[in-house]
Amino acid sequence: MDAALLLNVEGVKKTILHGGTGELPNFITGSRVIFHFRTMKCDEERTVIDDSREVGQPMHIIIGNMFKLEVWEILLTSMRVREVAEFWCDTIHTGVYPILSRSLRQMAQGKDPTEWHVHTCGLANMFAYHTLGYEDLDELQKEPQPLIFVIELLQVDAPSDYQRETWNLSNHEKMKVVPVLHGEGNRLFKLGRYEEASSKYQEAIICLRNLQTKEKPWEVQWLKLEKMINTLILNYCQCLLKKEEYYEVLEHTSDILRHHPGIVKAYYVRARAHAEVWNEAEAKADLQKVLELEPSMQKAVRRELRLLENRMAEKQEEERLRCRNMLSQGATWSPAEPPAEPPAESSTEPPAEPPAEPPAELTLTPGHPLQH
C-alpha cells in the first residue's frame, strides 16, 4: 500500500491500494467514467454504507455535468484505469452524500428507471423531507462526518465513443440536438412509425424543458422555448391520435390552451380528439374557434365537420341497433313445460306471440380516419 497522497485539495487524502495501467486518462468534459465504489464510515469497524458491487452494476458519471457529489469527479480524475484507491474525505465534501446515497438505493430497488447514473435535477427537493427513509442516512444527515471512499476505475470513454443521453448534454448541445430530434420525429411520422416518432418528440421536449428551468418565466428566452415546446407537444399529440390515445391528446391540448388560448393548432388537434370520442359539442366548439382565429382554415374545418357528422351518424346507428338487439332478446318467448295434469277449469290459453324477427345483419362502416 502506497503512503497517503494529498491531491492538493483541502480535506482529501488518497491512498493507492492497487496500481492502475497505462497513462492517466484524458478526462475531457463529456467523458463518461465507469467505476465501482464502496463508502465507509471512519469508525473502528469501518462500517460500510454503500457498495456498488452488491448492486451488481458499476456506476458512471459524466465529467463536467455538475455531479451531485462534486468531490467524486476530483477523486476519479486522479486515477488510472484499473487503479483501486482509498480516499479519506472531510466533512466539507461529504455533507450531501446521504441524499446521493438515497437516490442510489432507490435506483437499486428499481424505483428509478435511470439505474445507476444520477441526474443533477431535483436535488433541492430532497431537503423538503424530514427523513430520507433510511435510518443510517438520517443519522449522517443530522451529524455530517468524514467518509472513506474505495474506488476502482473501470473505464473512461471519450464523448465520441458512446451514445450520450440527452440529459447528459450541455445546454449548448441540447439546443443543437432539438431540431435534429424534431426532424427525425417528422420523418418517422411520415413513414407511419408513430411510436418511434413520439419518442423523438418526447426527447426534444425534455431537452427544452430542462433549458427552460434555467430561464425566468414569461421573459423573452423562456417564451421562445415555450413556443418550441408547444410545437413539439402538438406533434406528439398527432402521434397519439394515430395510436388512438385520444384522452391523452385532450389532456395535453387542454393544458396548452389554458396557458396559451390563441394557439390555433391546439384547438384543431383537440377537436379531432373530441370527434374520436363522440364529444360532438366540444368538437364543434373547437372547430368554430379555429375559424375565428384562422379563417383561411375553412376548408379543413368543413372536412372535419363532415367527418364528425359521419361519425355521429354511425354512433347513432350503432346505438339504435344495440337497443333493437336488447329489445329483441327481451321479447324472445320460451314455452315452459306443460303441467302433468292441467286443472280442469283452466281454459286454453291463446298462443303466445312469436318471437320478434332478429335484426338483419348490418355491416358498420368504420369511421373515416382523420387526416394528419
From Swiss-Prot:
Main location, first listed in the record: cytoplasm
Q: Where in the cell is it found?
A: Cytoplasm; Nucleus
Alphabetized UniProt keyword annotations: Cytoplasm, Nucleus, Repeat, TPR repeat
- Region Disordered, residue ranges: 325-372
What PROSITE patterns does this protein's entry cite? TPR_REGION
UniProt signal peptide: none
Molecular function as annotated in GO? peptidyl-prolyl cis-trans isomerase activity
Q: Name one GO cellular component term.
A: nucleus
Q: Name one Pfam family in it.
A: PPIase_AIP
**Mind telling me which SUPFAM superfamilies this protein's record contains?**
FKBP-like, TPR-like
> Which Gene3D superfamilies does this chain map to?
3.10.50.40, Tetratricopeptide repeat domain
Give the residue spans that cross the bilayer. Answer: none
What region holds the PPIase FKBP-type domain? 53-145
Q: Which domain of life is it from?
A: Eukaryota
Stretches forming TPR repeats = 178-211, 230-263, 264-297
Primary role? May be important in protein trafficking and/or protein folding and stabilization.
Oligomeric and partner information = Interacts with NUB1.
The protein depicted here goes by the name Aryl-hydrocarbon-interacting protein-like 1
- The gene for this chain is AIPL1
